[in-house]
Each structure stands twice: as structure tokens, then as C-alpha cells.
Amino acid sequence: MIIIGGTATNGIDENLSKIISVPLLKVEHKVFPDGESYIRIPQHITNQEILVVQSLYPPQDKHFVELLLILETLADMKNNKITAIVPYLAYSRQDRRFKEGEALSIKTILNAIARAGADVLIVIEPHKEEELSYFGKEVKIADPMPELAKEVSKKVEKPFVLAPDRGALERAKRLAEQLNAEYSYIEKERDRDTGEVRIKNLPELRLSGKDVIIVDDIISTGGTMIQATRAAYEHGARKVISVAVHSLFLDNAYEKLINSGVKEIVTTNTIPQDPSKVTVVDVSPAIARKI
């Protein structure tokens, strides 16, 4: 077995190599003057079990193409089994057609990864588990909640886990079980034209004096988290901690979250982060459990 470190790993390939004691080989990579990517596997590998690590954080399209180049090159070398480890799976939120003629982007992405030569796919906390069926082969989902819970437990006294929507309820349950805490959810609706998020309904919440942990799979612009934070304080929360597996922090989302009352943010290294601003949890142990 050998680990191939791609062009967008954020150190996960190196950490994984140490945890499972498997050698790491980094791809050679450069960018041509016209912006196209050059990829080379620096030694001939054949008849091996391969683990390819490549996250699809921004620039997503470039990192995706580079993943395909790596996979097909390894497939051409006639290897036994190729596992694509994609910590952050871009386009995963485009899993349904809300309007006629829209691209079903996640289907295209997963089909391409399979065709390029991946036999197995490992992802961290997908937006929706059912969307992974488009890969058409073996899929493993690595769960980082034990690692996230370990960090969160250091920051709370009376934890209450809150999902910002019904879709995140199962995620909230998993974190709550790790923290031995209660959990609930907020009902929301999103305008498909403007992207605006509105709270539709609030189940009865007993948050007075509680340290509320709002957990979601992804922070993009932060709108969902901000709405949930305001609702938590309106229901008596003592403080709010934001937990997200994948954090993009677009459009000054970090500053907006802090201004909304979020006291701390705990996230992972599936996407590069500034450790002076957020607590960063390594997902490599979660991946190792699936190998």
C-alpha cells in the first residue's frame, strides 16, 4: 500500500501516512503559463493498493481536474486498487434540480471520479449520504465527530447541541451522543433565487443557561449559522459555539459569525484555516478508521 499526496491535501496525506504507517509519495506538480496543470507520479507504481489524497477546496475546478489526472495516471500504471480520499467534496450541495435545466453537479463529479479510475471513495461528512450513490462503487464515510467532540468538550459546561435545520439533525445527534448532551433542530427555508435563509419554525427549545453548540456540515457564507445563533440567544443560551466540518468562510463569514455572537468556532482541516481564528481538528484519524 502507498499513499499518493495530491496538489490539495492540507497536510492530511502526511498525517495519515504517520497514523497508518504507510509510505507517502507526493505528486510532481506545476502550472503551465496558460494556467493548465502538469501532473507527474515521480516513480512507476504497479500492482499496488493506492490511497490518493486530494481535497476539493477552492479553486475547486482546478483541484478536481488535478484529481482526475492523478487517478487516470495511476490507473494506466495497472494498479490493483485505487481509493480516492476526498476530504472536502466540492459541488455536494448541488444534489437536486430545483429548476428545470439545472446541472446535477454532484452526479457529474462522482461519475468522473469513478471513470478516471477510483475503485473506492472515502469522504468526510458529505452534505447528504444518498448523493454518494452516483459514484456507483464502494463508498466509505469517515466520521470526524469523535475528534470534534473532544475539542468542544473543553469549551462547554452545560452543552446543548442544535442543528440549524432538520437535515442536520442526525449530525447533531451524533455530536450530542459524544457529549452526553440534549439536542434539537431549527426549521428553516431558503429562497432558491436569492439564497436568503429564513427561520420557518422553532420547536420548543429549553436553552436557558446552556452552552449551545450549533453543528452543520459546512459554513459557506455563514447565513444559516447566524440565523441559528440569533435564535439560540433569543431562547436564553449562555453562549454559542459554532461547529462545522467544512468551513469556507466566504464573504467575510467569519467576522459576521463573531459579530452575531458566536464565541468560538471549531472546524476541521478538510479546507485550509487560520488557526489563530478557529480551532482546527485533524480528520486524518477519522480517515484512518476507514482504511
Swiss-Prot record:
Binding locations of D-ribose 5-phosphate: 190, 216, 220-224
Pathway note: Metabolic intermediate biosynthesis; 5-phospho-alpha-D-ribose 1-diphosphate biosynthesis; 5-phospho-alpha-D-ribose 1-diphosphate from D-ribose 5-phosphate (route I): step 1/1
Pfam families, sorted: Pribosyltran, Pribosyltran_N
Chain sites annotated for binding Mg(2+) 1: 127
Free-text cofactor note: Binds 2 Mg(2+) ions per subunit.
Binding site residues for ATP: 34-36, 93-94
Binding-site residues, Mg(2+) 2: 165
Gene Ontology terms describing biological process: 5-phosphoribose 1-diphosphate biosynthetic process; purine nucleotide biosynthetic process
Any one GO MF annotation of this record: kinase activity
Record-listed E.C. numbers: 2.7.6.1
Principal subcellular localization: cytoplasm
Residues annotated as catalytic: 188
InterPro entries referenced in this protein's UniProt entry, alphabetically: Pribosyltran_N, PRibTrfase_dom, PRTase-like, Rib-P_diPkinase, Rib-P_diPkinase_arc
Protein name: Ribose-phosphate pyrophosphokinase
